[in-house]
C-alpha cells in the first residue's frame, strides 16, 4: 500500500454497492459461486424460494442456497465507506419523504388547475350559447291543417300594451296556402261584413296580432335567457273531431313552448286567443254598423250585410265586444289520442313534457285536440 488515492464518483460507487433486487445498499452480502453477482441475503433467498432458480442479473442456473456464499469482505468495505449505516438510511428516508410530498403537492396543484380550466371552458360555452328572443315564446300560425301566411306571428297575449318588448326578428317558419286569410266587407253591417267563415284569421292587417302568442311574459332585449328545465315542445293543436261542430270557430294551431308548461296554460292561452280573435272580427265589422252609409262593394241597398242599412237608426243594435277579463282555463278541455282513435282527457296540472313521455312516445310533434267545456266551473 503506497497511499495512492483514486477518485470515484458517487454515482458509480452507488451502482457497485446497490442490490439489483431491492435497489438499496447491500446488507449481509451474498455472492453467487458461479457468476459472482452480489445480492442482499434476504433478497436472494426470497427469490429462490419463489421458484426462480436462476441469477436475477445474468439468468445463470442457481440450484439452491448452496450456490451462494457470504461475502464479509464486501460488507467490511461498505462499513468503511459508510461508517454510520443508520444515519445514511435515515437521510435516505427523509429525502424520499420530501420527494413524495413535493410530488403530491404538484399533483394536487395540477388537478386544481385542470378543474378550474374545465369550469371556465364550460362557463364560456354557456355564455356563448345563442339567446333567442324569448324562451317562453309559443309560435303559432293559423290554417286548416297547414301553417297560415301570417306576416307577423309574434303577438304577446299577456302583455298587449308593450309590443316593443319583443326583441329581434322571429325565426322563419314554413308557409302554406291554407285557409288562413279573411275577407272583410267594407260596407257591411254588424254580422254580414265578415266573409272568412270558421277559422278565418286577419293576420296580415293586424301586423301579427293573430299569428302567435306566448304563455308567459317576454324577456327584455339583451337579458340572459331563463333556464329551460324541460326543453322545448312542438305540438299541433286541432279541434276535437267529434265535440267541435264545423260551424263553430275552430282551426288547427301550431304551437312551440317549453316543456314545463301545463295543460291549464294551454287552455288559458286558447281561451284568450279565441276571445281576442272574435273581438277583432267584430271590430272589423264596425264600418257597416249603426250609422254607417252605403258602400260601393256592399249590397244593393248599400248595407253590405244582413245587419247593415242605408240609414243608421233602423239597423239592429251592435253586439257588445267580448271581455278578456272573464277568460278562464276551464272554458276549454284538452284531449289526446295516443292511438286507436280513443281520446283521453288531460289533467290540467300535467306538464307537456310529462304528457309527451307518458302518452306520445313518437318522434313527431305532439298532437292535441281541444273542445269547449260543456259545464265550465
Swiss-Prot record:
A motif (Nuclear localization signal) lies at residues 172-175. Residues 217-229 have a biased composition (Pro residues). Residues 201-377 are annotated as: Necessary for interaction with CBX2. The modification Phosphothreonine is found at residues 186, 191. It comes from the Eukaryota. Residues 1-205 are annotated as: Necessary for transcriptional repression. Coiled coil: none annotated. The modification Phosphoserine is found at residues 9, 111, 158, 161, 200, 203, 219, 225. It is found in: Nucleus speckle. GO terms for molecular function: chromatin binding; ubiquitin protein ligase activity; zinc ion binding. CDD domains: RAWUL_RING1, RING-HC_RING2. GO terms for biological process: chromatin organization; negative regulation of DNA-templated transcription; protein ubiquitination. Component of chromatin-associated Polycomb (PcG) complexes. Part of the E2F6.com-1 complex in G0 phase composed of E2F6, MGA, MAX, TFDP1, CBX3, BAT8, EUHMTASE1, RING1, RNF2/RING2 MBLR, L3MBTL2 and YAF2. Interacts with CBX2 and PCGF6. Component of a PRC1-like complex. Component of repressive BCOR complex containing Polycomb group subcomplex at least composed of RYBP, PCGF1, BCOR and RNF2/RING2. Interacts with BMI1, PHC2, PCGF2, RNF2; CBX6, CBX7 and CBX8. Interacts with MN1. Constitutes one of the E3 ubiquitin-protein ligases that mediate monoubiquitination of 'Lys-119' of histone H2A, thereby playing a central role in histone code and gene regulation. H2A 'Lys-119' ubiquitination gives a specific tag for epigenetic transcriptional repression and participates in X chromosome inactivation of female mammals. Essential component of a Polycomb group (PcG) multiprotein PRC1-like complex, a complex class required to maintain the transcriptionally repressive state of many genes, including Hox genes, throughout development. This is E3 ubiquitin-protein ligase RING1. The lineage of its organism: Eukaryota, Metazoa, Chordata, Craniata, Vertebrata. The gene is RING1.
